[in-house]
Amino acid sequence: MSVFAFSGAAGTGKSTLLSDVTAPITALAEKHGRKVVFQEERARKVFHEKFSSDYRSLEDLLQTDPLGYQLALAEAFSVDAQQALRNPHIIYIADRTGFDVAVYSMLLGGKGESDAYKIRRIFDLLHNSLHVVDHVFLTQPFGGTAERDGFRPAHYEDPAKRALEESMFSHIGVLFPNTTVLPDGRQERVQVVVGRIDRLLYI
């Protein structure tokens, strides 16, 4: 089993990086005689599948039931983990991980007994899913603000919350040793990701 994931604060280039590495990782998989699956971005998919009929936007959902959304994401990552376990010869490339769910669960917070249950359930699911991730590539902030693309909620523009978000992600490398903190340069990131995956597939 080989599961490689991109993680990091909003607006740090994960989606761009995923697009940039698609072709070289596909070629790399062929070189190693493996198939590769680029898993769908969970944030938008989960919102549209489970919440879009009741909420106009993610921002509306986060104002009403932020941990309900994070719980749905944790459940989706758990499903991904089970899929990876059943297909050990496939290389999985994931946009975000359970680490991201943990960060945003803490960042968004909650109140009341129902949210306490959701938090317990979220971390139970993450415990079951994170152990299948072989390596995390962590994107660092570029020093700017997160791009507003019509999906990211407004609280990402709050400087205090933004600083807290970035601080939380900076500790992932301490908590999970199989982490590579990526450089800022676009080409350098591609080279680091492809090179590291190539070496890990030989292990």
Regions found by a protein language model. Give the residues of each.
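A glycine- and Lys/Arg-enriched "phosphate-lid" helix/loop adjacent to the NTP-binding pocket
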Residues: 104, 108-171, 175-184, 201
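The conserved Walker
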Residues: 10
